[in-house]
Amino acid sequence: MAYLLKFLDIFRWKKHYGREWGIQKIFMDLIKERMNRIMSKVYIFFADGFEDIEGLTVVDLMRRAGIDIQTVSIKETKEIRTSHGIDLLTDRTFGECDFSDADMLVIPGGMPGTKYLEEYKPLTDLLTDFYQNGGKVAAICAAPGVFERLGFLKGRNATSYPSVMEQLKSARTSLEPVVVDGNVTTSRGLGTAIDFSLSLIGQLEGSAKAEEIAESVVYVRA
């Protein structure tokens, strides 16, 4: 950004000395357009055994919405195997990221994926710091249980997979497909993955964009 501002200063100097205003105006218009198109940045974390649909639905729909969502392996390699035996490569490993540009952090459910995510201290430290500084965090299925144990759900409305609900002792539990309370979003499971994804898109890009994506994939709400 500093480089761009310096470039604009050069153009202003040229204008002051009688050079073409048209070039400056075109350049400034391009910069404004580019700035208006800056994408939200989201990181979603995968461990072996994460639930396929819960994780990849978020990635698919966010990318359709123009959101820069990066898949992150908590292993030393990018190779991940889902809970149903699908092998995939993430965009990055955890160690390759600094997360300073994050607008939202997401963890999917699935077993044993959720257990591995919770056991990875660099991730729980990141989530805690991000949450405490007001960053948006989201979890689905078994993963809200991780948020409970990190203290994110105290006094909040939340939901989760049915068998995990009893773990959310500090929260006001709900049977809604998706629950948003402040900077925390929780959802119930595989069957609510589209609603979950659309809610996250709406929070980042507005309800109109979420509706646009819902229509584009012919999603019919019950």
Locate predicted features.
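Active-site-adjacent pocket-lining segments in enzyme domains
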Residues: K41-I44, F50, R64-S73, R92-A222
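Short, solvent-exposed amphipathic alpha-helices that sit
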Residues: T57-R64
